[in-house]
């Protein structure tokens, strides 16, 4: 991940949804949308954003289109992605769960039930949170608190991405053999 300014990482700042999907996109090697042939003309899939708040030319445009195409990210409703909204801890867990191909559980005891605020996890996030906890990608705050709806700090995102990458054998890595050393783009440094 890059810093927020030269020589400044800002670990306690929150990470936006756009910054997270950009980090994942860069870790995946910045793939171009696949071309599709229609009536003899080649067209790029998802040339038009499905979200009103993801305009063509925005620094996060390609990463969001990639994330949607790969099934990694979804909008927040009403045709919006909310790129500037802080990513929550449960959103982060679910996004990484989707990156892993949404594997099924192993039937073991639910790790999520050990946390005092397990009931605060949104129903759509339970499976992803359970998966991330089981693999120790996600850890609790202050002991036994998940804080699922709270914003994820840049430090938490960096730690979770590192643990996520550590869980993969090289052949099964969802990012292929990409060795991206700069997965997060600063808002002032737009993607081409």
Regions found by a protein language model. Name each.
Residues 126-129, 154, 158:
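Short amphipathic alpha-helical surface patches that serve as generic macromolecular interface elements
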């Amino acid at each position: 991940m890059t810093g927020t300014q030269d020589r400044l990482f800002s670990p306690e700042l929150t990470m936006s949804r756009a910054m997270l999907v950009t980090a994942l996109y860069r870790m995946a090697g910045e793939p171009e949308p696949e071309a599709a042939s229609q009536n003899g003309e080649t067209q790029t899939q998802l040339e038009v954003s499905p979200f009103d708040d993801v305009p063509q030319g925005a620094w996060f445009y390609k990463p969001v289109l990639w994330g949607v195409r790969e099934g990694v990210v979804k909008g927040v409703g009403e045709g919006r992605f909310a790129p500037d909204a802080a990513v929550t801890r449960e959103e982060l867990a679910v996004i990484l769960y989707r990156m892993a191909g949404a594997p099924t559980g192993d039937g073991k005891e639910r790790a999520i039930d050990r946390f005092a605020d397990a009931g605060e996890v949104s129903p759509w996030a339970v499976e992803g949170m359970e998966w991330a906890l089981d693999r120790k990608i996600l850890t609790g705050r202050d002991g036994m608190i998940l804080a699922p709806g709270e914003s994820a700090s840049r430090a938490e995102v960096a730690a979770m991405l590192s643990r996520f990458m550590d869980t993969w054998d090289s052949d099964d890595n969802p990012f292929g053999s990409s060795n991206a050393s700069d997965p997060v783009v600063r808002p002032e440094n737009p993607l081409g």
